[in-house]
Regions:
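Acidic, metal-coordinating helix/loop segments flanking the phosphotransfer/catalytic sites
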Residues: 38-57
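Active-site residues of response regulator receiver
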Residues: 61, 91
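Short, glycine/charged-rich "phosphate-handling" switch motifs in NTP-dependent
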Residues: 108
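The feature encodes the CheY-like receiver
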Residues: 65, 83, 95, 113-114
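Conserved acidic carboxylate
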Residues: 16
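C-terminal output helix
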Residues: 115-125
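Charged docking surfaces used in two-component/phosphorelay signaling
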Residues: 23-31
């Protein structure tokens, strides 16, 4: 993974309940220059969303305990100050209905786990470039 594409601070909210996946993502993202704010469940993510300024990007697992990624996505899209934040959904299975719902609700992209780290990096960089 290369360094971040711009000099300003890149913050990413990661909502992922699977510990191994979260550790891998935090490592990859930190190497890419991101400051990662991690929530291990949907309720924790909602609390963080209410308390933090909008990040550069959001990665949401679709299947989270307490509040699903789809519920969080809808919640984020209702917050005016978060409207511009790119959101990538992560899913353990390629259920077309969930993917369609996510895109219709306001997700910018999705990735099926297990994911290719280089592909994830490329997708994130694409959204960072668009935002800059």
């Amino acid at each position: 993974m290369t360094t971040a594409p711009r000099a300003e601070k890149l913050t990413l909210l990661l909502a992922e309940d699977e510990e191994g996946t979260a550790i891998l993502l935090k490592f990859l993202l930190a190497r890419g220059g991101y400051t990662v704010v991690h929530a291990a469940d949907g309720q924790q993510a909602k609390t963080m969303i209410d308390q933090m300024p909008p990040p550069t990007l959001v990665l949401l697992d679709i299947m989270l305990p307490y509040l699903s990624g789809l519920q969080l996505l809808a919640y984020i899209r209702q917050k005016a100050e978060w409207q511009h934040v790119p959101i990538i959904m992560l899913t353990a299975d390629s259920n077309e209905r969930d993917i369609e719902r996510a895109l219709a609700t306001g997700a910018n992209d999705y990735m099926v786990k297990p994911f290719n780290p280089r592909e994830l990096t490329a997708r994130l960089q694409r959204f960072v470039k668009v935002a800059s």
